[in-house]
């Protein structure tokens, strides 16, 4: 599995700011969007372009456009919504596919409860967004669903990943690509990433 830890200074700086224990909801949301945008830049670097001719201000001009790439952004509810706008800044016409999965706090197992996928998902590149890759359960369940519906090209964008989550994802889906702003130390006994960001969903939605 291709794993890319984005080491750009802006990404590292912004993730550092997100680790502050008393960060405001407003600031956390802003940073989640900004880092999501920067991760998108990295994740789409291999998109092919083609030459097309358009009508410019002074007549026809040849420009580069992304070649035949249909994209769907797949936020995992609810925390993934906090990264979605950062992705859409670059691809405002991308279709949105929503997957609802929560993690049982006792068993740490993923529990699916909702999905609404874009049409022609089998023809699209899926950019799956979720702030945290902890145990990997929710991400694996989401990718299972996408593949069941015929999606063959999947890239995962997360703010922070744990080694345990990366290992589980690679074992289940070695053909996906993972882009993360940080690979942290480990999971604690409650399945939270250490040092991590805390509960990203609570911080994004102001329910902490």
Curated annotation (Swiss-Prot):
- Name the pathway it acts in: Pyrimidine metabolism; UMP biosynthesis via salvage pathway; UMP from uracil: step 1/1
Q: What is the lineage of its organism?
A: Bacteria, Pseudomonadati, Pseudomonadota, Gammaproteobacteria, Vibrionales
- Can you name this protein? Uracil phosphoribosyltransferase
Give binding positions for uracil.
Answer: 193, 198-200
The alphabetized UniProt keywords are: Allosteric enzyme, Glycosyltransferase, GTP-binding, Magnesium, Nucleotide-binding, Transferase
Instruction: Tell me the function of this protein.
Output: Catalyzes the conversion of uracil and 5-phospho-alpha-D-ribose 1-diphosphate (PRPP) to UMP and diphosphate.
Cofactor(s) listed: Mg(2+)
Q: State the organism named in the record.
A: Vibrio parahaemolyticus serotype O3:K6 (strain RIMD 2210633)
InterPro entries recorded: PRibTrfase_dom, PRTase-like, Upp_B, UPRTase/APRTase, Ura_phspho_trans
In the record, biological process GO terms are:
UMP salvage; uracil salvage
Q: Which gene encodes it?
A: upp
């Amino acid at each position: 599995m291709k794993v890319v830890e984005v080491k750009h200074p802006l990404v590292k700086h912004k993730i550092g700011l997100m680790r502050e224990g008393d960060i405001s909801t407003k600031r956390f949301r802003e940073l989640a969007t900004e880092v999501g945008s920067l991760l998108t830049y990295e994740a789409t670097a291999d998109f092919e372009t083609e030459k097309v001719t358009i009508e410019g201000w002074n007549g026809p001009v040849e420009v580069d456009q992304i070649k035949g790439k249909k994209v769907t952004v797949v936020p995992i509810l609810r925390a993934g919504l906090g990264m979605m706008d950062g992705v859409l800044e670059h691809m405002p016409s991308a279709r949105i596919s929503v997957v609802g999965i929560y993690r049982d706090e006792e068993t740490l197992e993923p529990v699916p409860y909702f999905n609404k996928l874009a049409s022609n998902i089998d023809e699209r590149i899926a950019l799956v967004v979720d702030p945290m890759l902890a145990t990997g359960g929710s991400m694996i369940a989401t990718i299972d669903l996408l593949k069941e519906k015929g999606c063959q090209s999947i890239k995962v964008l997360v703010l922070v990943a744990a080694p345990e989550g990366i290992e589980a994802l690679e074992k289940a889906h070695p053909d996906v690509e993972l882009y993360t702003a940080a690979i942290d130390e480990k999971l604690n006994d409650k399945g939270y990433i250490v040092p991590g960001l805390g509960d990203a969903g609570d911080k994004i939605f102001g329910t902490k």
